[in-house]
Amino acid sequence: MASKTKFRGSYTALVTPFKNGSVDEAAFRSLVSWQIGEGVHGLVPVGTTGESPTLSHDEHRKVVEWCIDEARGRVPVIAGAGSNSTREAVDLAVHAEKAGADAVLVVTPYYNKPTQEGMYHHFKTVNDAIGIPIIIYNIPSRSVVDLSVETMARLFELKNIAGVKDATANVARVSLQRHAMGPDFIQLSGEDMTALAFMAAGGHGCVSVVANVAPKLCASLMSAVLKGDYATGLAIQDRLVPLHAAIFKEPGLAGAKHGLKLLGRLDEVVRLPLLPVTPPTGKVIRDAMVHAGLLN
């Protein structure tokens, strides 16, 4: 039950820019600075959207360090520290803490399909190794396992477990988790399209892919609903819905990078086995950005 009051609002799941086969530090730092200037409430480097599966561990650590250094304490940084190897997750989490991260995001172990008890011990081992908050990342569509509400409740008894990034897209989970763990258990939506409904059910914020492209709009939506102004939130959502759909027509990180390319902020290079979006999807993304008022 870690201190978790600051984890509210719109947290951008940052893309990782590449240039000439390497991570582009200058472009990444520029992205971080722009995001903060646009009013985002927090940053999440090297998660799924940051292409963590195709980063080396050295690259992963450098991106975390650059993000923390560039943020300079202006917004919280929740560093990705997930792995399907508990030992690797611990190593990444320990590094993130030493680098100055405010919290770590730890995904449910993917591919090896652990039991609920196995997942409990995975998170407990990370919990016991560090002294900063841990946000559980529950994403059954990618991990093939779903951390149950009951297991989350057990984990919330540990000192550093602060909440969940819930990418189930099942809004009912928000109410079930709120009932089981109470309102202090931080619930961050991991789905842009359902984030407004997620907040209405008791959520605290969103870890957003679309915020890469529309940071000010995403932050404004979250700020409005956190104040109970759902009319304003819905009006902003109406502007963003086509963009939510467009960015995820193909892998979301590729869609986000294409949107950032259209804004002139970075190249859309991704690492295999992912590819840049196709021209038809690129047109849909552009049209959606025009609808949102991001492009003329």
Swiss-Prot record:
Site-annotated residues for Part of a proton relay during catalysis: 48, 111
Active site location: 137, 165
Residues that hold pyruvate according to the record: 49, 207
Enzyme class, UniProt record, top EC level: lyase
Gene Ontology MF: a single term: 4-hydroxy-tetrahydrodipicolinate synthase activity
SUPFAM superfamilies the record matches: Aldolase
EC number: 4.3.3.7
Entries under SMART domains matching the protein: DHDPS
PROSITE patterns: DHDPS_1, DHDPS_2
UniProt main location, coarse: cytoplasm
Compartments, as annotated in UniProt: Cytoplasm
Subunit structure: Homotetramer; dimer of dimers.
Protein purpose: Catalyzes the condensation of (S)-aspartate-beta-semialdehyde [(S)-ASA] and pyruvate to 4-hydroxy-tetrahydrodipicolinate (HTPA).
Homology family: Belongs to the DapA family.
Protein name according to UniProt: 4-hydroxy-tetrahydrodipicolinate synthase
Protein species of origin: Nitrobacter hamburgensis (strain DSM 10229 / NCIMB 13809 / X14)
Gene (name only): dapA
